[in-house]
Amino acid sequence: MSDDNAAKIIFKKKSTGKIVGEMKATSLAADTILQNDNKSK
């Protein structure tokens, strides 16, 4: 039982880190698009 709980906690930490990483990648892409948009004007 305790092993199962530990596995769930590890999975939660991994999935949270993945979500944060995706959010950073998305905001980085948005910044690049905005910069390119400003250059084209």
From Swiss-Prot:
Top-rank lineage group of the source organism: Bacteria
Source organism: Bacillus subtilis (strain 168)
Entry protein name: SPbeta prophage-derived uncharacterized protein YosF
